[in-house]
Each structure stands twice: as structure tokens, then as C-alpha cells.
Design a protein with these regions (language model features):
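Positively charged, low-complexity/disordered segments
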Residues: 345-352
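Acidic, mature catalytic/reactive cores of soluble proteins
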Residues: 4-344
Length: 352
């Protein structure tokens, strides 16, 4: 079971998917390989069945969280009298040698040893496909492969410099040097080690520093504005679509039934986000958004819908997941939406 701390989450992402990480360093929401794909971890919506990935430490540890300045790399700091370490969470995001953006469905968890002999247990508890089936693990010398009986085509691979057996058996680990985890949607061809992890960290760090450097600066509240813009960037799909939210089924009122899936692109809301990014120096976001809108026209006389799937899908469906309890028992949990059938005249004014 994953114990939910609060609704104070850090978010990491790479314009393909995103993860919500609690104040104690637990990944409680993650969909692979894309924003609207089935969840791997969803304890946000069901503490018992949803699945999470985190660190168990004694109550003596003090835990704090912040972002690496000017980036979407999240730092969770663990300290006690016995030792101290930091977990740096990020998704690789940078331009490759071919000048294309490299946005793999991957999460790195870089464990940086600071001092002493800190101890922890790893709680690796994936529940693929929205926890709709039995979870199956295969442990090899290189990785832990995980898939779900309800959807065995989608598989996740956990690589680590730590003992995979110790991780699987939840044994206590004493940290003596830098270590890492890599959770990937694909089996890796190249060797995965701590040096590779550091390279991916540096590339991603430089990408975000360059992105914020191109952003307009303000004399007042610049840090708050910059952080808000970084979040807006994370909610953008690489093709230009902008999501209304990174999650599904968080209730408008706890205990109520108005729980919707917002992992889609509503044109009015997206236009406001794009206008903001354009005004502060990111014209490329506006160009990608316009290309996305153009891609939704599949015939000469097509009309606007109020919203689309993040790949431009015009027809969507909604499914209710009865087996999940929902956030604070707020049922139902929904995936998908039928909001595309709604018609509101004011929705396209802002786009124009």
C-alpha cells in the first residue's frame, strides 16, 4: 500500500508523458508511454491497488523537496543523523545529434549520496494498465520486466545499479555511493550504468536551462512566473497539443461524481496557454499548436470541435474503472471522454 502524503506534488515530464511525485519522493501517477496511456503507478486514485514507486525510510529522516533551479528536474532531500542523500528525478528531454527532440518514455531516479550511511527500502510496486489485471515480474541479470495479464504487450523495464533481488524483496539498502534507477517503456540496447545516467542528467539539465534562458524575465515575481511557465511547457505534447491536465478523475468536490479525464486538448484553454508562451518568447509553441489544429481537419468542410485527443483524435470514448476507489473514495474513475460532442459557441473565439 502507498500512503498518500497530501496533494502537494512535484511534477516531471518531457512533453510526451509526466509523473506526479509526492513530498516524500513517491511516484504516485505515471502513464507510459504517453500522457493518455494506461497508468503504471496510480496510487493517487487508489492507495491499495494503484501502485507507486518510492523510498521507505525511518521516521527520523527529514524530507524536503525542490526543483533544480530553472529546470523541471525534481530534487527530494533525505537527511538524518545516520546519513544524507538526494533523489533527482527527471525524464530525458533534449535535442539529439539529428536536431530532433529526444523524448523517450523513461524516468531516471539519480540517487546522490551526500554523507554517512543512509538506509532505505525501495517500494517498487507497479500496477500496469490501470491495475486491471495480475502483475507479472520477470527478473533478469539486467532488469526487472513488468507487465499486466490484461495487457501483456505493454512492458516496463527497471534498470538499477542496486541489487535487483534486494529491490524485489524490499530488503534494506545501505547507501555508500551514487546509485540510479531507470524505468523505461522499452528494453535498452545500449549498456545502462551510472555514467550513462549522469550523461542523460547533464543533457536534460542543459535543455531546461536553455529553455528558461530564452524566456522573458520580470523584475517582480520572476521565480514564480518562471515555474508556472515550466509547468505549462510540461503540459504540452510534442506535436503542439496542450493538455487541460496531466491526470484523470480528481474530483471537483471530494466524494462527488464529477470526476473527469482531462488528458486531452480543449482548444480554448490551450489557446490561452499558447498565447502566454508566445508573449514570453516561445513562438515555436504557437507554431506547433497551429500545425496541430490544422492536422485535425480531415476534410474540406470540417468544423472545429471544442476538444481533441492529443494526436488530433476527433472521436473518443469514455470508460469507467469500477475496480479503483478513486481519490479519497471519490468514484467513479473515468478514462476517456465524450466531451467532444458538446457544442459551445464561445469556445473558438479565443482561437480566432
Amino acid at each position: 500500500m502507498c500512503i498518500r502524503d497530501s496533494l502537494n506534488y512535484g511534477v516531471i515530464g518531457n512533453c510526451r508523458t509526466a509523473a506526479l511525485i509526492s513530498e516524500k519522493g513517491n511516484i504516485e501517477w505515471l502513464c507510459f508511454p504517453d500522457f493518455d496511456s494506461p497508468s503504471i503507478f496510480a496510487s493517487l486514485l487508489d492507495r491499495d491497488k494503484g501502485g507507486c514507486f518510492g523510498f521507505e525510510v525511518s521516521n527520523e529522516y527529514r524530507i524536503s523537496q525542490s526543483y533544480v533551479p530553472h529546470t523541471n528536474i525534481l530534487s527530494t532531500h533525505f537527511s538524518s543523523d545516520e546519513g544524507e542523500f538526494v533523489v533527482l528525478d527527471f525524464m530525458p528531454c533534449y535535442r539529439s545529434y539529428e536536431k530532433e527532440h529526444y523524448l523517450p518514455a523513461e524516468i531516471y531516479r539519480y540517487i546522490r549520496w551526500i554523507k554517512g550511511t543512509p538506509r532505505f527500502k525501495v517500494n517498487y510496486n507497479p500496477a500496469p494498465d490501470y491495475a486491471r489485471g495480475k502483475v507479472i515480474h520477470n527478473i533478469t541479470d539486467e532488469y526487472i520486466e513488468t507487465y499486466c495479464s490484461s495487457e501483456n504487450k505493454d512492458r516496463q523495464y527497471l534498470y538499477s545499479s542496486l541489487s535487483l533481488q534486494d529491490i524485489e524483496q524490499k530488503k534494506e539498502i545501505t547507501l555508500q555511493r551514487d546509485e540510479f534507477f531507470l524505468l523505461s517503456y522499452n528494453e535498452k540496447v545500449i549498456p545502462i550504468d551510472i555514467e550513462r545516467e549522469k550523461l542523460e542528467y547533464c543533457r536534460t539539465l542543459v535543455y531546461w536551462l536553455n529553455w528558461t534562458n530564452r524566456t522573458k524575465k520580470y523584475s517582480l515575481y520572476n521565480d514564480v512566473i518562471e515555474r508556472s511557465l515550466l509547468v505549462l511547457k510540461l503540459m504540452s505534447y510534442y506535436n503542439g497539443a496542450v493538455l487541460a491536465a496531466l491526470t484523470t478523475s480528481l474530483p471537483e468536490t471530494v466524494g462527488d461524481v464529477r470526476n473527469w479525464d482531462y488528458r486531452f486538448c480543449w482548444l480554448r484553454d490551450a489557446s490561452m496557454s499558447i498565447e502566454t508562451l508566445f508573449q514570453i518568447g516561445h513562438a515555436g509553441a504557437a507554431r506547433r499548436f497551429m500545425k496541430f489544429i490544422q492536422s485535425t481537419f480531415v476534410a474540406k468542410h470540417e468544423s472545429f470541435q471544442i476538444m481533441y485527443g492529443i494526436r488530433g483524435e476527433r472521436q473518443l470514448k469514455e470508460i469507467i474503472l469500477d475496480h479503483l476507489d478513486g481519490y479519497k473514495n471519490s468514484k467513479p474513475v473515468r478514462i476517456g471522454t465524450v466531451s467532444y460532442t458538446h457544442l459551445r459557441a464561445h469556445e473558438t473565439r479565443h482561437d480566432l
